[in-house]
Amino acid sequence: MSQEFDYIIIGAGSAGNVLATRLTEDADVSVLLLEAGGPDYRFDFRTQMPAALAFPLQGRRYNWAYETDPEPYMNNRRMECGRGKGLGGSSLINGMCYIRGNALDFDGWAKEPGLEDWSYLDCLPYFRKAETRDIGPNDYHGGDGPVSVTTPKAGNNPLFHAMVEAGVQAGYPRTDDLNGYQQEGFGPMDRTVTPEGRRAATGRGYLDQARGRPNLTIVTHALSDRILFSGKRAIGVSYLVGNGDNPATAHARREVLVCSGAIASPQLLQRSGVGPAALLRDLDIPAVHDLPGVGANLQDHLELYLQYACKQPVSIYPATKWWNQPAIGAQWLFLGKGLGASNQFEAGGFIRTREAFEWPNIQFHFLPVAINYNGSKGVQEHGFQAHMGSMRSPSRGRIHLKSRDPRQHPSILFNYMSHEQDWQEFRDGIRLTREIMNQPALDPYRGRELSPGVNVQSDAELDEFIRNHAETAFHPSCSCKMGSDDMAVVDGQGRVHGMEGLRVVDASIMPLIITGNLNATTIMMAEKIADRIRGRQPLPRSTAKYYVAGDAPVRGNPVRA
């Protein structure tokens, strides 16, 4: 079977769905969207109910469930690396935190030759274009975009307010919008949830607009085997359908757009003969183009939890008990309200741990229950926790193809905690979190420290706790980076260096990981590049003001030292 389209998009994740929707707005353009996973079943509470966010991570239907190689600085642990599978990609299984990154992340990108139009003020119009915020638009937020964003409301859990107040009492700024004028500080955290209380994945927000268009063809359970080339030009894709072994072929008249994410995009390029020559040679893959940066520069956010018992019965611990869940589920299903309609990450913050950092290097998510991210090992009492992680680790990893078999996972190594700066940031972060948690605002609630525990104090004790307990925040990125240096894979429009008719558009093309969760920024990048592909003028630059700390101290005097 062979078909021909103008564009073939490989991967229906956050970026691929944006491109499929925007490109098919032009009625004379035909698009094939290939997705290795299945549909985003709207009746499956595991992906549709925000509070059920732990469930998709536990199975394989919606999760590629990659594992790292033994991480040498983490006691050789093989660490989890979940990625979304199905229409929506990782937006179908993520934590739904709507965080864009810091303005200075993008200004930093724009200092690289060829990336000058990636400054914050160039990107902000595309963040706004993608968003509908429930309380309306302003200079920073959109009012009519495909991504539904819900803000925390009065009357939510008192622990959220107490944790924000504790951050302010510890001497840090208060901010009313982590995506607005000032990211630095503590405040409410927005989430990608619809007004009806459903997960706002990109299958819902974007693809629902485009599914009925005659110029869009969506094929699920389609695992791309390799990109087809004529010389240096991408001309199509060979893919497997379901469990079959007979490849189908589709041809692209204009471009092949790789949107498979930071793990699978470099894997697919390498399998197709675009990557480091020595690696291709070792696997007997005919080299189409020697591009050493494919799979290099891999970055992620690492985080850990500090957990406390709660002296008052105000945590959502009862909601983890099966006998309370039918009522929560019914309220969510029929009314779109209640505990089920929230991801429970309704407060957070960003701080600088030392003067050397020009913008925040630590992120907090606050959660009014003590439990693991994937729903396991819940503490059997009322509790709460702070997720704390460093934002711009100097550690760099890599993705290496292990086999020409498209169903075999690649070798993944993040090299977590391979720099002294990593250890300094995490030790500082744990100690500062304890100071925050010890402020008067939490006195009515704070019981004993459950984790790490009061006996974990010295550098050596903290380091061993980090080695054993730090986990991924599920933010792999930067493995096909934008730029013009020898290790760059794509230019500022996502076009693969040295190739024709081939782009990569997803979190893998970030040159440097951002300060915060990745989904909102991945959507923004796809919106921006979609205009380029369509030959449209970029949206006018924003003139919004944004905070630069400059000489401001990292914190003021705490209420309780």
Curated annotation (Swiss-Prot):
**Could you tell me one molecular function GO term of this UniProt entry?**
betaine-aldehyde dehydrogenase (NAD+) activity
* Record field: catalytic activity: choline + A = betaine aldehyde + AH2; betaine aldehyde + NAD(+) + H2O = glycine betaine + NADH + 2 H(+)
Q: Out of the domains of life, which is the source?
A: Bacteria
Q: Name a Pfam family for this protein.
A: GMC_oxred_N
Look at the named UniProt entry and state the broad enzyme category this protein falls under.
Answer: oxidoreductase
Q: InterPro entries, per this entry?
A: BetA (IPR011533), FAD/NAD-bd_sf (IPR036188), GMC_OxRdtase (IPR012132), GMC_OxRdtase_N (IPR000172), GMC_OxRtase_C (IPR007867)
Which Enzyme Commission numbers does its entry carry? 1.1.99.1, 1.2.1.8
Q: Where does FAD bind?
A: 6-35
> Which SUPFAM superfamilies would you find in this protein's record?
FAD-linked reductases, C-terminal domain, FAD/NAD(P)-binding domain
GO CC annotation terms, alphabetical: membrane
What is this protein's function per UniProt?
Answer: Involved in the biosynthesis of the osmoprotectant glycine betaine. Catalyzes the oxidation of choline to betaine aldehyde and betaine aldehyde to glycine betaine at the same rate.
Name of the protein in question: Oxygen-dependent choline dehydrogenase
Protein's gene:
betA
